[in-house]
Amino acid sequence: MLAAMIILLTGCGTGSVFDGSRASDASGFRMEYSILNREESADLNLTEGDRLRVSLSHTEGSADVIVGMEGKTPIYRGNGQQNADFVLEIAETGSYHISVSGHQAKGNISFTRISGEIK
């Protein structure tokens, strides 16, 4: 009986690193998770004049977020983010690396490309 309880309790720790869904395509990068305790990333091709809408909503934990082009100063860096909704202006065409590192985070995050093209 004691051995069974020990096995049961050790399976209930905070060892999970990711339980959720993620999607990445030309329009953006989205994740929803009941636990995010690692880094997830995606690359998004953006054009000068585009905007990137960033939305974070966490009911538990937090996330560190970095958005930028390889080898350049990031256009955004936020540590310990819980809830936010803002827009980044894209000043240079290129491939932008988006990195999200969760810390016992539960919630969702999205990065949505808003085209700068005039229609």
Regions found by a protein language model. Name each.
Residues 40-42, 82-88, 96:
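Short strand-edge motifs at loop-to-beta-strand transitions and within beta-strands
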Residues 37, 48-52, 92-96, 106-107:
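Short tyrosine-centred short linear motifs in exposed loops/low-complexity segments
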